[in-house]
Each structure stands twice: as structure tokens, then as C-alpha cells.
Curated annotation (Swiss-Prot):
InterPro entries: CapZ_alpha, CapZ_alpha/beta, CapZ_alpha/beta_2, CapZ_alpha_1, F-actin_cap_asu_CS. The keyword Lipid metabolism does not apply. Component of the F-actin capping complex, composed of a heterodimer of an alpha and a beta subunit. Component of the WASH complex, composed of F-actin-capping protein subunit alpha (CAPZA1, CAPZA2 or CAPZA3), F-actin-capping protein subunit beta (CAPZB), WASHC1, WASHC2, WASHC3, WASHC4 and WASHC5. Interacts with RCSD1/CAPZIP. Directly interacts with CRACD; this interaction decreases binding to actin. This is F-actin-capping protein subunit alpha-2. The gene is CAPZA2. Belongs to the F-actin-capping protein alpha subunit family. PANTHER family: F-ACTIN-CAPPING PROTEIN SUBUNIT ALPHA (PTHR10653), F-ACTIN-CAPPING PROTEIN SUBUNIT ALPHA-2 (PTHR10653:SF2). It comes from Didelphis virginiana (North American opossum). The keyword Acetylation applies. One of its GO terms (molecular function) is actin filament binding. GO terms for cellular component: cortical cytoskeleton; F-actin capping protein complex. SUPFAM superfamilies: Subunits of heterodimeric actin filament capping protein Capz (SSF90096). The modification Phosphoserine is found at residue 9.
Length: 286
């Protein structure tokens, strides 16, 4: 092990550490970071070399954060990244600094977004927040309005998690939805992601995703938002139902097939008569 450590350059050590951090299960960033810190045994190298991994993890996981002075949380996503460690809270129209290691928001300042699309963004946000409140008890959503390649685009992100470390499991739901504001009809594109880690007497992870495409009729802001939420609700309900059904099927078939119902002898042992068996006598005489 010592020989291997001598062969690895600092760059290679940081690259390996960054991979561990980026792939940390939901709710277990600190545990993975502390383990990597012990292995690397060089705090300055870890902080400087793996800073991009801290940021990538939060962006990928849609990490929710609360800004002091504001009631609701906002998600850390690539769509709100303003550069130089600053992010956008489109609901409250503020920018803020985000510490990717401590996961803290500071220095909120007024920020003017794209006013031309704000009425659309606001309508979708109101509808999306009502939907998330109904379906995700711990859910957070952030809705952006941006011009991408000359097209006015709405992007809605949802995050919901349950961290149950004392029960040896953690899980997170993420979904991202986009559509452009074009006359008559437009295409809705979504991606749904589930990640769950169970680690009592074992180590099992569920990592699943599904891509969605559908068409949306574009009329006024409020009606379009309602129709958009119908698409979101139908797709997410269908996905969650399919996941549950697959697990039930696996429980009834696949997992049972992994274990013999009878020993190789095809005969069950009567433990009450164990002493009458040869093995029982051998154990008794041992």
C-alpha cells in the first residue's frame, strides 16, 4: 500500500478523491468528505484540488439552501449559476454567494432577471409550488425564465429528499422540466431521477432515471402553466408507480431466486430432532 501511495502523484490523488466525492450518495457528502480527507491526509491539497468536485456534487444533486432573511429554500442548479460562486434565486430576485463545502448562502443582493419572460416564469412557479406542496412533503422547487439560443425558455427543477441515517438509508428525488414559449404548441422535455442508498447489513443503491417528452398547447400564462403541471404530474406519477411495481416484482421473483428454499439434500431439517441426526450426535460429543 505504501509503494502504491509513493507512485501516485498529487494530481492523481486529487482525481481519485474527486470521484469519491462526486459519487457520494445523497445525504452522505460529509461522511465521504471526511473519509477522503483521512485518506489524502492533506487538507490544502483536497480543498484546492477537489473544489470543482464540491461544486459539481451540489449542482448535480439540486442541493437546497436557505438564504437568511427569506422564507423558502432555493435549489443550487446549473441554471441559476451566475459564475464566481454566485447563484440566482429567481423567486426573490436576488443573487447570493454559495459555499459549496459548507453549503451556506451569504451576501444576498437584488438581481434583475429577464423581465420579458417574468410573467410566464411567475405563473409556472405558482402552479409548480402548489403541485410540489401536494405531492412532496419535503419538496423544494425553483423555476427559471431564460433566453436560450434566442428562445424564451422556462426551466422548472424539483428536489425532495429523506435522510434517515439512524435507519441506515438516504434517498433523493430530482426532476427537471423545460419548454420554450412558442406560438400554438411546444415540446416539454423532462428528466426524472431517483437515488436511494441502503446500508444496514449490506450496501445497496438504487440509481434510476427516465427521460420524458410531451407536447404542450401554449395559450396564456395561467392556462399554459396549468397544462404544463398536468404533464408533469402524469409523468412523475407513472414513473413512481413503475418503480414500485418493479420492486414488488423483484421481491416476488428475482430476490427469491437468489436463495434456495431447501438445502442441497432437498430435505428440511427438523431442529427439534437435531440430536437424532448424525451431525447432532457429533456436535453433542464434541
Amino acid at each position: 500500500m505504501a509503494d502504491l501511495e509513493e507512485q501516485l502523484s498529487d494530481e492523481e490523488k486529487v482525481r481519485i478523491a474527486a470521484k469519491f466525492i462526486i459519487h457520494a450518495p445523497p445525504g452522505e457528502f460529509n461522511e465521504v468528505f471526511n473519509d477522503v480527507r483521512l485518506l489524502l491526509n492533506n487538507d490544502n491539497l483536497l480543498r484546492e484540488g477537489a473544489a470543482h468536485a464540491f461544486a459539481q456534487y451540489n449542482l448535480d444533486q439540486f442541493t437546497p439552501v436557505k438564504i437568511e432573511g427569506y422564507e423558502e429554500q432555493v435549489l443550487i442548479t446549473e441554471h441559476g449559476d451566475l459564475g464566481n460562486g454566485k447563484f440566482l434565486d429567481p423567486k426573490n430576485r436576488v443573487s447570493f454567494k454559495f459555499d459549496h463545502l459548507r453549503k451556506e448562502a451569504t451576501d444576498p443582493r437584488p438581481y434583475e432577471g429577464e423581465n420579458a419572460i417574468e410573467s410566464w416564469r411567475h405563473s409556472v412557479e405558482n402552479a409548480m409550488r402548489a403541485y410540489v406542496k401536494e405531492h412532496y412533503p419535503n419538496g423544494v422547487c425553483t423555476v427559471y425564465g431564460k433566453t436560450i439560443d434566442g428562445q424564451q425558455t422556462i426551466i422548472a427543477c424539483i428536489e425532495s429528499h429523506q435522510f434517515q441515517a439512524k435507519n441506515f438509508w438516504n434517498g433523493r428525488w430530482r426532476s427537471e422540466w423545460k419548454f420554450t414559449i412558442t406560438p400554438s404548441t411546444t415540446q416539454v422535455v423532462g428528466i426524472l431521477k431517483i437515488q436511494v442508498h441502503y446500508y444496514e447489513d449490506g450496501n445497496v443503491q438504487l440509481v434510476s432515471h427516465k427521460d420524458i417528452q410531451d407536447s404542450l398547447t401554449v395559450s396564456n400564462e395561467v392556462q399554459t402553466a396549468k397544462e404544463f403541471i398536468k404533464i408533469v404530474e402524469a409523468a412523475e406519477n407513472e414513473y413512481q408507480t413503475a418503480i414500485s411495481e418493479n420492486y414488488q416484482t423483484m421481491s416476488d421473483t428475482t430476490f427469491k431466486a437468489l436463495r434456495r428454499q431447501l438445502p442441497v439434500t432437498r430435505t428440511k431439517i427438523d431442529w427439534n430432532k437435531i440430536l437424532s441426526y448424525k451431525i447432532g450426535k457429533e456436535m453433542q460429543n464434541a
